[in-house]
Structures are given as structure tokens and as C-alpha cells.
Amino acid sequence: MAAKDGASAPGKSGAGSGSEALMRAALSAVAPGTALRDGLERILRGNTGGLIVLGLDKAVDSMCTGGFVLDVEFTSTRLRELCKLDGALVLDKDITKIHRAGVQLVPDASIHTEETGTRHRTADRVSKQCNFPVVSVSQSMRLIALYVHGERRVLEESAAILSRANQALATLERYKLRLDEVAGTLSALEIEDLVTVRDVTAVAQRLEMVRRIATEIAEYVVELGTDGRLLSLQLDELIAGVEPERELVIRDYVPEPTAKRSRTVAEALTELDALTHTELLELPVVARALGYSGSPETLDSAVSPRGYRLLAKVPRLPGAIIERLVEHFGGLQKLLAASVDDLQAVDGVGEARARSVREGLSRLAESSILERYV
């Protein structure tokens, strides 16, 4: 991943979803395989520097003095040649046109910056004052830095990013293997009605660990551009179904609201996301994020699923029907004990669908028990 200054703590939201989305879009724009990245590499090879604003509005216009207006089509060779001039370049936000060249950027000097070089100080201040990314190419240090709302990323060679990405992918594979184990155990315990809060917490913990490492790899994919195609395919295969499973587990086990404690599915997911990596390793802390007390007694207490997760595995069963089945029967054990006639009592469930649900649940129950004991 590109080097990051002032990163937020793991598991915590940093500069905000807006800035994060803008940073991802900017990283994608300068990724290998793009015309902009090709132009930046040409600038480095030519032993020159550059300062490029990726967007133009009134705020950027007010900071520009001198130079000249071009409004020509963007190409990597034009970028390279125009960066030989003193001054900055201003592109459109879609990086299809070069609006201005040779301009001097004069941002508010009172804006704090910890950068030292003139070009980098200007890039940092401009990025904080406007809503567009700014790219600074250092001639002396031979590096490309990207600034978004004051956050700085130094772009690296694909080989360095791929090395870390492959390590992260190996970690994801181990995490996913362990997740499959604990999820399989949970399914078998659900059939036998032997689930404890500890079992649920272990699955929620593993799902969150997988989600986080997958998010990290997804950032590598963005930064790698065309070089990350194979990595993207591997990631998609490994995390298929993980995000829906995460929500289904919470929906199955989030405690019923009480006078002292109440937590929605969305709140539980937010609480899990807010945990640091250290907190995520503590089962009592994860249990509290789900809405339980987190005491040793609570971890060993019995709980019963509502049935969302198992019903979601029944083929061709719409979400609306799943909601009605859960609402009608109130729990997985009653669903498992329901006959075809009982299932038909639910609005929208005819004889064919009732048989499909009955057979699907029976097959899932048999396979879960076999996987646990064979």
C-alpha cells in the first residue's frame, strides 16, 4: 500500500467517509496502467518535478496566478512536457483535459503544514483548501506524493505493493479457513440447540477479522491498477458471501431490546467496526459490541438463533419470505420442527415452497451434523 502519514487507528474511521472515498478515487486515478500514472513516471524519468491539481473550481481558480489557459486534451506526453515549465498544472477532475499550465498556486499561508519542500508545502495547503487531490512530483527525492484533504500518500512501485498484498492474501486465506471452521461448528450447534454466546462471538470475531484484511487487500488492488487484476480475482473468490454472512449472524443473535440494553443490527455492526485490533481479540469486548454484557457467565449462557442465516442457505427463498417465516415461528428450532402444513400457514408460502423449505432445512441439518461429527 502507498505509505500513509497520520493514519487512523485500526478499526476506527479516519478522516471521514467523504475523504476516504476521494482518496480511493485519487489512488485509482494515479494507479499503474492509467494515462496519468504514465505521465508521472515520465516526469520522474526526465529528472524534473511537477505540481498537478486534479480538478478546477472557483476555490482552485482563486489560488491560481500567472500561467496560461490551455483547455487541451490530456495526454501523458503533454503532461511531461508542460511540467518542464515553472509552475503548476490544473486538470479537470475526470483527467481528460489540461485546463492551465505554468500557474503559480497561492493557497492560504495560515493553513498549517508539516511539509518542508516548497512544492510539497503548496500541495498540502492546496489539498486542504480545495476539494480536489493534488499530486506533487519531487525532482530531488524522486518520489510521487498524493495529497487529499491534507492526507499524504507516497506512491510506490508495483513490486513493493504486490509483496505486501501477497502476504495479506496469505493471511486472509488462513483467516477464512478458521472462519469456515467456527461457522460450521455454529451451524451444527444451532441444529442441536446448543449455542452459547461464546460460539456466536467467535464467529462474529472471525467475520470481522476477515472483513478487515479483505478491506486492506482491496486498497492494494486500487493502488495496483491493472497490475492488481489477478489479486482482485483471488480476493473476490475468498470473500464471496462473507459480508452477507456477517449481517445474518448479527440478525440471528442480536439480543432482544430491554429497558437497560438495546442494540439494532446496524448499531452492532458499527460497534464491531469501531473496535481496535487489540479489542477485537477479546471475546468479552466483542460480546459487548453485539449487545451482551461480556461477563464470563454471559459468554457461557445459551442463546437460540432466529433462523435468518440457515434460511438464507435455502435455494430460491426470497428475503421477504424469510422475514415472514422468522416472524411467524420466532426461532430456528420451531422452524426445524415445522411440518409442510405449518409452513403453508405463512403468508406467501404455498405447498411447493413449503416443501422446498422443509427439504432444504432437513438437508442443511444433516450436512451440518455430518461435518461436525464425521
Language model features: what each stretch is:
Residues 244-346, 351-374:
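Long, highly charged, low-complexity intrinsically disordered interaction regions
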